[in-house]
Amino acid sequence: MLLTTINDPQDLKKCTQPQLHTLASEIRQFLIETLSKTGGHLAPNLGVVELTLALHYVFDSPKDKLIWDVGHQAYVHKMLTGRREMFPTLRQYKGLCGFPKMVESPHDVWETGHSSTSLSAAMGMATARDLKKEKNHVVAVIGDGALTGGMALEALNHIGHERKNVIVVLNDNEMSIAPNVGALHNYLGKIRSTENYQWAKDEVEGLLKSIPAVGGKLAHMAERFKDSMKYLLVSGVLFEELGFTYIGPIDGHNMELLLDTLKTAKHTKGPVLIHAITKKGLGYAPAEADSVKWHGIGTYKIESGDTPKSAPTYTSVFADTMMKLADEDHSIVAVTPAMPAGSGLIPFGQKYPDRLFDVGIAEQHACTFAAGLATQGLKPVFAIYSTFLQRAYDQLIHDVARQKLHVIFAVDRAGLVGADGETHQGMYDVAFMRIIPNMVIMAPKDENELRHMMKTAVEYKGGPISYRYPRLPTRGVKMDEELQVLPIGKAEIVREGKHVAILSFGHVFEIAEAAVNQLQEEGIKPMLVNARFCKPLDEELLFRLAKEGYDIITVEEGSEMGGFGSAVIECYSRAGYHGMNVQIVAVPDYFVEHGSVKEQRQEVGLTADHIAARVRSLMPISKGVVEA
């Protein structure tokens, strides 16, 4: 097997061009077989096999800098840079990361996870190279979806203005393609940038005719992103006006064409943009047929493509409840930044196509767009992953909270997220939202309470409000028939107890409850509280606990710094209860890497055993006090 002889890009350079085709086939087979056992981002990587081989064949990594936007399509890059044998540990605890990781290899020159960052990083590296008078190439690979992000467009503007030697490879795959005819064929006549275009023209035209969905994709994006995006992707003129030499569109699976194009770009002065058309999931029929499903996948059967049946999740409960609420209240609309499937909003969009707004990878715009909707009496539900809400922080403060607008933040993937690791952990939403005036922050103990919080949010009249929920299966609790409006800022005492009160915020209630059950078998009976709200806190309850002499343990799956526990401590400090003993069980002040949620919780101490041990240490007998 030729692939087993490739342990470094220098090994790849010894291959003949015909051998590269053999390698491409072997790599696809390796990906399909390995990911069937580990799960991972299959479709994106099947789509960049030839492109990745060509990049490492033409350029000299790590001297030449290869940057992968988002990074989920870097598996082939990892295979070619000495990490093939680590793939059985992909995305597992202490195993191979699913994204570029500098500590893994000097060939990973930039760590990614969020989209649209590669071009800014490339510009920084190219500028540093020039200041240091070094000689190397900087190449950024970015998808057509990520290119719509404002940060990427800002970087294009800067690169073009400075005329830096940066090569941008636009990986135009089928993630957003609709099956109708578009204007890409006419686009070919406008390309004038390289000498190799004339001999490649007939081949490229044949490619486009053989993939009719490409034109449909551009038409679809033109419709979604109006004239600006049509101008961007249907015409190379804009890139050239920005200062780039534009090459393309080319077949991103034609090895010879890729090699020639990259060599041309390598010797072109100034910024270059190569527009490569690739097919997501190429080489595995199920992934080609449904690139959305196979973008990120769990384990599967290779022959059939069957995946294990998944249990109901908090996201699916959110999706069902959104439909119920929208049926009753026609002012409810949904906003998502390119995540309608992940956020569970596809059924909502099918039933209410004029009430779902997918604005693309544009979190800042999405947040202020929702604010604009709210000024006109609509009730926008901004469905966004916790990790991506970080990208709209100024808009959250300046455009939503400051104006006290009724925008509902449905914060999905809150807490530890497992295999996607540190770039996707939902650790910080509570901390960064808690300090914003006018904001209400909720977190349910289970899926039934999530539904009530969703009802509470749409009925709330006081400004912005949020609820956070995890990327986890539901608990399977009984669901109430009628949705209730919860009193703002009021906690729920689930079990009365003595000496110690456990205040649980959010879905970690299950862990706190397990700790209490364990302790009760030992005759220890702490109070168990479902906090429900981080802002406003239930101060009446907190002051009662202080007056009655309770020690307090707060439990949350979020940042220890600035989170729910910090809010409790601050509350006591403001009220003058300076002697209160409040211990925080949360995620410590470091980035938690990939693994299962169970393993991550064990690492950070978010377990029933850990909480129970904390409680025991606070009981009177542990302090040397004998109860009467």
From Swiss-Prot:
Oligomeric form and interacting partners: Homodimer.
EC category name: transferase
UniProt organism field: Brevibacillus brevis (strain 47 / JCM 6285 / NBRC 100599)
Pathway where it operates: Metabolic intermediate biosynthesis; 1-deoxy-D-xylulose 5-phosphate biosynthesis; 1-deoxy-D-xylulose 5-phosphate from D-glyceraldehyde 3-phosphate and pyruvate: step 1/1
One Gene Ontology term, aspect cellular component: cytosol
Protein name listed in UniProt: 1-deoxy-D-xylulose-5-phosphate synthase
Catalytic activity: D-glyceraldehyde 3-phosphate + pyruvate + H(+) = 1-deoxy-D-xylulose 5-phosphate + CO2
MF GO annotations: 1-deoxy-D-xylulose-5-phosphate synthase activity; magnesium ion binding; thiamine pyrophosphate binding
Keyword tRNA-binding found: no
Cofactor annotation: Mg(2+); thiamine diphosphate
Gene that encodes the chain: dxs
PANTHER family: 1-D-DEOXYXYLULOSE 5-PHOSPHATE SYNTHASE-RELATED, 1-DEOXY-D-XYLULOSE-5-PHOSPHATE SYNTHASE, CHLOROPLASTIC
E.C. designation(s): 2.2.1.7
Binding site for thiamine diphosphate: 72, 113-115, 145-146, 173, 284, 363
SS bonds (residue pairs): none
Cofactor note: Binds 1 Mg(2+) ion per subunit. Binds 1 thiamine pyrophosphate per subunit.
Biological process, per Gene Ontology: 1-deoxy-D-xylulose 5-phosphate biosynthetic process; isopentenyl diphosphate biosynthetic process, methylerythritol 4-phosphate pathway; terpenoid biosynthetic process; thiamine biosynthetic process
